[in-house]
């Protein structure tokens, strides 16, 4: 595994650990924000390792998945747009209150992010 891949993977792992802790402590806004970041960074690790390219400087998971040439259509979800939006929305108090205060709204995003993260991590090994 390349040095840069290891760095991206470690940052992704750290973000995942924070996301899990935030979810356990019912800090929904931070949970979804860190899950989005964990997924973004594990995709970037995959791009560095498998595509041998620099990942695009974006938070848009669709763009990164396309660059990585990862086909998620066989996963139980295929629309990661809402998870991509989460990073931007959580950065603004009015948007984070509007979208991510209810656990019932955040839970599907957390579950999707965890499945996607683990699937991409498996592709890396």
PLM segments and residue spans:
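Terminal alpha-helical segments
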Residues: 1-125
């Amino acid at each position: 595994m390349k040095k840069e891949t290891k760095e991206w993977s470690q940052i992704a792992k750290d973000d995942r650990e924070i996301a899990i802790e935030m979810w356990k402590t019912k800090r929904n806004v931070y949970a979804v924000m860190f899950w989005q970041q964990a997924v973004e960074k594990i995709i970037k690790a995959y791009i560095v390792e498998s595509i041998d390219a620099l990942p695009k400087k974006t938070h848009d998971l669709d763009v990164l998945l396309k660059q990585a040439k990862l086909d998620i259509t066989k996963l139980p979800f295929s629309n990661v747009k809402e998870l991509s939006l989460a990073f931007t929305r959580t950065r603004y108090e009015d948007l984070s209150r509007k979208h991510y205060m209810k656990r019932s709204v955040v839970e599907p995003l957390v579950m999707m992010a965890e499945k996607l993260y683990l699937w991409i991590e498996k592709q890396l090994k």
